[in-house]
């Protein structure tokens, strides 16, 4: 199966029930609370954390106190029970301050979403309360060194042995992998690719699981991205999520939430780049006047603002559709594609507007420029997104249903 087939596979998974829409006033209050938190606690320290590539332990503890690890988890299971519209607003604000924080939340949320959508009641009761509180952090483990967008190459195996599965293989690009207590794992079983939740203690080694490599990155600093090697690791059969052989469509459906997250964090980075450019253009003067009064700069600012607003609306549309329980592979792909390209373009334009200062580490725009490419590549490259979008559109055109 190629990633272009992913839309069809995800559509085979049972649709989640429509979420209860969060009251608009509550949504605004939550997002404003996060905005103030970012301005007070994140923005002042982000440059140092970025430079040192240091995990933001104190900020993560404060995020736990705010309930940000349980935004979409139902209140009955200890979460805030908020909708995806609220979630993307939270992610945008975190990305505005420091994009790395959104990675800490995103893979955790995707792991929790897999359990919410496809886990049994017993599994939900067992895992989600500690995830909602942030006591246990989650990770998602789909990609492998030789299997990224081409999911047919997944080689990690889980072999049934009585009441357990024995897992062997290597997973790549695992965000939160070392610090996670729960890992949503895609592994090949006799029936096909199946989804499991692996329980582990945070750390580099645990009962046949080893962090075999820490990946150095251009941006996205402070959060670990690792390879994880499984050697005869035993997973209880009770940790199988849903039916054996149905893991791929389940996880690909969850990746729609991941792509909406990528889009919202791209909006946050793009907004930060735009605000930096707008502010600097009014402060910096050339030829006797602020550069904001030069027509060339005004044209750039107009285009930047327009793309930013379009990216935000595409992301909101995808979130609303997902929350309504509708298929949104096309909409999530469009949002991810456009918003990530917008973040890349706006970070470059912001650097150009800053001139030489934009190339220095004294200004935050160089960080936006380093962070933006992750959104173009992550959760399926933009080339793959275009294929998913096109296939989805053609499928809808052939259908008498949604067009």
State each model region's role.
Residues 163-164, 168-210:
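A short core secondary-structure module
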